[in-house]
Each structure stands twice: as structure tokens, then as C-alpha cells.
């Protein structure tokens, strides 16, 4: 008799994705982040669902409904902070996942990579809208500043902004639609994740050497399911430590003040995971130029398969490119720091130099380093 997990139409899909999936024997812990992102998504959907049961998307009651969740709802405080800090863990895993993709040349699976970029944009949109919902000062002014960027689009910009706002300023209509979109987007993300996995399982996973590993594969379960479980325990440990000991560490104190359109905070800034994008946006004094730089800083990832000049896939055996990769990481950390600083000397010039370096490394230095390495190896 055939095993049910290999014959049942539904269970067969799960079996081929998580149990009998042929996996390269040599993938490292950097490959854990995919499953950790799945875990983060589940945590966010569950905690978000319980929060939505008590939240009201009205400008008069939104702030007090979040306070009510923390004070009066059973375990509301932990659900709220798991959700808020879960977003930080989500982006931490997301950036590690993208970094691993760049380091080991996973972008050479273009379908998987491009769906990944769409996923990144969708998750960023979801997180931005979620930040608006508590209706604190930073929520309101963050929404005002970021949605206002659409007005930089020539000809249709102003109409587009008012269409997004649902009026002539960020108000009740904006909050209501942001709540509706914030609720639906994680389910769209889940659907995109399935497409992402579908394309990944068409080609199979990459591995640290960047070589074809068809001849040397092992089943995903129990080898990697156990390894992923360890990563999951560590993720939950860090999330709980953050939530229980310093839940507000990554938040902004201004968001504990109810939104007031008549009082602008001295320094408007997004959550930490958007700070490096925000620094790139601010580094160009022109509004349209800044918006273009912001969009290109994300869409530049789609060019990576075209910019790959090396005859080796991974950076494992390419010291020049390795150096550039870690300079890029340091540059992104610098941009994150700059994004949180006020717009004054010397932060302005540091931000501009770091932004130029970001684009230069990806568009110029990495492709040249690949060609030099080919030449040194006489390939």
C-alpha cells in the first residue's frame, strides 16, 4: 500500500515541500532564514488577528484602543509588543535572507529572486501601514511625510496623494484604509511566499559553493527540519527577551503622544528597519531625486543577475568581492545610523557619501571585481 503522504493530493504537496524535498548536503545556517521568515509571518498574522479584534480604526479612538489593549485586555500587552517587536525580527531575518542571496549568488535564480523583491516591497508596505495604526505623533507625521512623497511624481502627483489620503490631509479616511490594507496584505504576502517556494523548488536550493549539487542531496526531514527548529527556538528566545525586558527599545517615544496635526515632532523618522532607505531619500536635496533614489535603492536588487560578471556563482572563493560585500554591509549600517540623526552637518555629507558608495558598490565595483577575479584565475 502506498504511503498516504506520497499519494494524497494535498499531503503530497506538503511532503514534496517539507519532508522528502532533496536538499544540498552542505547548506549552512544562513539558509535557516527562509523558514524563520515563515515563522515570523505566522506570528505576525496570529498576533495581528487578536489585536484587530480590539482595535478601532477611528482617529478619535485609535490611540485609546491601543492603550485599552495594553491595560484592559487579558495578555493584550504581550500580544501588542510581540506584534511590534515581531516586525523588527521579521526585517532582521529578511535582510539576512537577502544578504545571503547576494553573498552566495542565489539571485541567479531570477524567478525566485524577482518574486522575493515583490515580497520585500509588499512587506515594507505592510510594515509602514502598521506603524500608522497606533495614531501617535510619529504614526501621523510618518504617514504625512511618506505619502507626501507621491506628490513628487510629475503631473499626477497631487491628485495621487489626495486619492491615497481620501481627503486633503491624513485623516480618518486614511487611517481606515490603512487598517484595511494592513489586514489584507499579510495574506497576499502568504500567497506570494507560496509562489516564491514554487519557483525555488523548480530549481532546488543553491549552496555555499555555488556548484550544482544534484549528485549530493539529502531529504529535508529530519536533517534540516531539526536544524530549522533550532533556529526557530533562538528566534523565539530573542523575540521574548526583547518583548519582556525592553519592549520599547526599538520604538519611538513620540508615538506615546496622541497624534496632533498642529504640533510637528522635532525629528520625524521611520522605524529602524527603514532608516537606511530614509537616509538615501534625504541625501538628495531635490524631492523627485530623493524619491527616485529611494525606489532605485530597492529595485537595484532586480539588476543583480544582469550585473553578475564572475564565472563563479558564490563569493565563497572570491576575496575581492567578499571585501566589497562587507563594505556594503558596513555602509548600510552607517546609513541606518545617519537616518536616525537630525539633518545637520556632518550627518548630511556622511549620508550623501554613504548613499553614493551604496550605488557605486552594486553598479560599478562588484562587476569590476568579478572581471578582475576572472582575469586573476586566467578564466
From Swiss-Prot:
Entry protein name: Cytochrome b
Binding site for heme b b566: 97, 196
The family this protein is said to belong to: Belongs to the cytochrome b family.
SUPFAM superfamilies attached to this UniProt entry: a domain/subunit of cytochrome bc1 complex (Ubiquinol-cytochrome c reductase), Transmembrane di-heme cytochromes
UniProt xrefs under CDD domains: cytochrome_b_C, Cytochrome_b_N
Annotated InterPro entries: Cyt_b/b6_C (IPR005798), Cyt_b/b6_C_sf (IPR036150), Cyt_b/b6_N (IPR005797), Cytb/b6-like_sf (IPR027387), Cytochrome_b (IPR030689), Cytochrome_b_C_euk/bac (IPR048260), Cytochrome_b_N_euk/bac (IPR048259), Di-haem_cyt_TM (IPR016174)
Task performed by this protein: Component of the ubiquinol-cytochrome c reductase complex (complex III or cytochrome b-c1 complex) that is part of the mitochondrial respiratory chain. The b-c1 complex mediates electron transfer from ubiquinol to cytochrome c. Contributes to the generation of a proton gradient across the mitochondrial membrane that is then used for ATP synthesis.
Gene Ontology terms for molecular function: metal ion binding; ubiquinol-cytochrome-c reductase activity
Oligomer status and interactors: The cytochrome bc1 complex contains 11 subunits: 3 respiratory subunits (MT-CYB, CYC1 and UQCRFS1), 2 core proteins (UQCRC1 and UQCRC2) and 6 low-molecular weight proteins (UQCRH/QCR6, UQCRB/QCR7, UQCRQ/QCR8, UQCR10/QCR9, UQCR11/QCR10 and a cleavage product of UQCRFS1). This cytochrome bc1 complex then forms a dimer.
Keywords, in A-Z order: Electron transport, Heme, Iron, Membrane, Metal-binding, Mitochondrion, Mitochondrion inner membrane, Respiratory chain, Transmembrane, Transmembrane helix, Transport, Ubiquinone
Gene Ontology BP terms: mitochondrial electron transport, ubiquinol to cytochrome c
Pfam families registered for this protein in UniProt: Cytochrom_B_C (PF00032), Cytochrome_B (PF00033)
Transmembrane segments: 33-53, 77-98, 113-133, 178-198, 226-246, 288-308, 320-340, 347-367
Cofactor binding note: Binds 2 heme b groups non-covalently.
Subcellular locations according to the entry: Mitochondrion inner membrane
Annotated residues for binding of a ubiquinone: 201
UniProt binding sites for heme b b562: 83, 182
Disulfide links within the chain: none
Record carries keyword Membrane: yes
Membrane-protein topology: Multi-pass membrane protein
Provenance organism: Dugong dugon (Dugong)
Cofactor requirement: heme b
Taxonomic placement: Eukaryota, Metazoa, Chordata, Craniata, Vertebrata
GO CC annotations, alphabetized: mitochondrial inner membrane; respiratory chain complex III
Superkingdom of origin organism: Eukaryota
Principal location listed in the UniProt entry: mitochondrion
Note: Heme 1 (or BL or b562) is low-potential and absorbs at about 562 nm, and heme 2 (or BH or b566) is high-potential and absorbs at about 566 nm.
Amino acid at each position: 500500500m502506498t504511503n498516504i503522504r506520497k499519494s494524497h493530493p494535498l499531503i503530497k504537496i506538503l511532503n514534496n515541500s517539507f519532508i522528502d524535498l532533496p536538499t544540498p548536503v552542505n547548506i549552512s545556517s544562513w539558509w535557516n532564514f527562509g523558514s524563520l521568515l515563515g515563522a515570523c509571518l505566522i506570528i505576525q498574522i496570529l498576533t495581528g488577528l487578536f489585536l484587530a479584534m480590539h482595535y478601532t480604526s477611528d482617529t478619535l479612538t485609535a490611540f485609546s484602543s491601543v492603550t485599552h489593549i495594553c491595560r484592559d485586555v487579558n495578555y493584550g500587552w504581550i500580544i501588542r509588543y510581540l506584534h511590534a517587536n515581531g516586525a523588527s525580527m521579521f526585517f532582521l531575518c529578511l535582510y539576512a535572507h537577502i544578504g545571503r542571496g547576494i553573498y552566495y549568488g542565489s539571485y541567479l535564480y531570477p524567478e525566485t529572486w524577482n518574486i522575493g523583491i515583490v515580497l520585500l516591497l509588499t512587506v515594507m508596505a505592510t510594515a509602514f501601514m502598521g506603524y500608522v495604526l497606533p495614531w501617535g505623533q510619529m504614526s501621523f507625521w510618518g504617514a504625512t511625510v511618506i505619502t507626501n512623497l507621491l506628490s513628487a511624481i510629475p503631473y499626477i502627483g497631487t491628485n495621487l496623494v489626495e486619492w491615497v489620503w481620501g481627503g486633503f490631509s491624513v485623516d480618518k479616511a486614511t487611517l481606515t484604509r490603512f487598517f484595511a490594507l494592513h489586514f489584507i496584505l499579510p495574506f497576499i504576502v502568504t500567497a506570494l511566499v507560496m509562489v516564491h517556494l514554487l519557483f525555488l523548488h523548480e530549481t532546488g536550493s543553491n549552496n555555499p559553493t555555488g556548484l550544482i549539487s544534484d549528485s549530493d542531496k539529502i531529504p529535508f526531514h529530519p536533517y534540516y527540519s531539526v536544524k530549522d527548529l533550532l533556529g526557530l527556538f533562538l528566534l523565539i528566545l530573542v523575540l521574548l527577551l526583547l518583548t519582556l525586558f525592553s519592549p520599547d527599545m526599538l520604538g519611538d517615544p513620540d508615538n506615546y503622544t496622541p497624534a496632533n496635526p498642529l504640533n510637528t515632532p522635532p525629528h520625524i523618522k521611520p522605524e529602524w528597519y527603514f532608516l537606511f532607505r530614509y537616509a538615501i531619500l534625504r541625501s538628495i536635496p531635490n524631492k523627485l531625486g530623493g524619491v527616485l533614489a529611494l525606489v532605485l535603492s530597492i529595485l537595484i536588487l532586480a539588476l543583480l543577475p544582469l550585473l553578475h560578471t564572475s564565472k563563479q556563482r558564490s563569493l565563497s572563493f572570491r576575496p575581492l568581492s567578499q571585501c566589497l560585500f562587507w563594505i556594503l554591509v558596513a555602509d548600510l549600517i552607517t546609513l541606518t545610523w545617519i537616518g536616525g540623526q537630525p539633518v545637520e552637518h556632518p550627518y548630511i555629507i556622511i549620508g550623501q557619501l554613504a548613499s553614493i558608495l551604496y550605488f557605486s558598490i552594486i553598479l560599478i565595483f562588484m562587476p569590476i571585481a568579478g572581471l578582475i577575479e576572472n582575469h586573476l584565475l586566467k578564466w
